UniProtKB/Swiss-Prot annotation:
It comes from Roseiflexus sp. (strain RS-1). PANTHER family: 3-HYDROXYACYL-[ACYL-CARRIER-PROTEIN] DEHYDRATASE. This is 3-hydroxyacyl-[acyl-carrier-protein] dehydratase FabZ. It is found in: Cytoplasm. Gene3D superfamilies: Hotdog Thioesterase (3.10.129.10). It catalyses: a (3R)-hydroxyacyl-[ACP] = a (2E)-enoyl-[ACP] + H2O. Keywords: Cytoplasm, Lipid A biosynthesis, Lipid biosynthesis, Lipid metabolism, Lyase.
Length: 143
């Protein structure tokens, strides 16, 4: 398990855009399982939506990407590099995510070669699927 401090030592994201609270499982370069405790204090709930707060789907995808970045950048040869989104395919949102939910984020890489990777991301709340799709990323030593 990785704490928030250990996550911040691997990826450059910071509040309010750091969207994972801990890593529960990690196989460097292969897969990671992360967790986001969704609270009413999240800045995006002020406008999405004031009377019915729902976590924006694009931020669920970003949380999956950050989880994947932890897995990719945990490899010794990738330390200090940056992971950039290269694309997303087939993303589907199945259920809304509300304040009070614990978002479980699992990313598994299907292939990774020469700094380009592709994987599958699945987000669940209480075992129920809320989002899934394919994520593509590129690693770079230049920020």
């Amino acid at each position: 398990m990785l704490t928030i401090q250990e996550i911040m030592a691997i990826i450059p994201h910071r509040y309010p855009f750091l969207l994972i609270d801990r890593i529960l499982e990690l196989e460097p370069g292969q897969r990671a399982v992360g967790e986001k405790l969704v609270t009413i204090g999240e800045p995006y709930f002020q406008g999405h939506f004031p009377n019915r707060p729902i976590m924006p789907g694009v931020l669920i995808v970003e949380a999956l990407a950050q989880t994947g970045a932890v897995a990719a950048l945990s490899l010794p040869e990738n330390r200090g590099k940056m992971a950039f989104f290269a694309g997303i395919d087939g993303v589907r949102f199945r259920k809304p995510v509300y304040p009070g939910d614990t978002l479980r984020l699992e990313v598994r890489f299907d292939k990774m070669r020469r700094g380009i990777g592709k994987g599958t991301g699945v987000a669940t709340v209480n075992g129920q699927l809320v989002c899934e799709g394919e994520l593509m990323f590129a690693l770079s030593s230049e920020g």
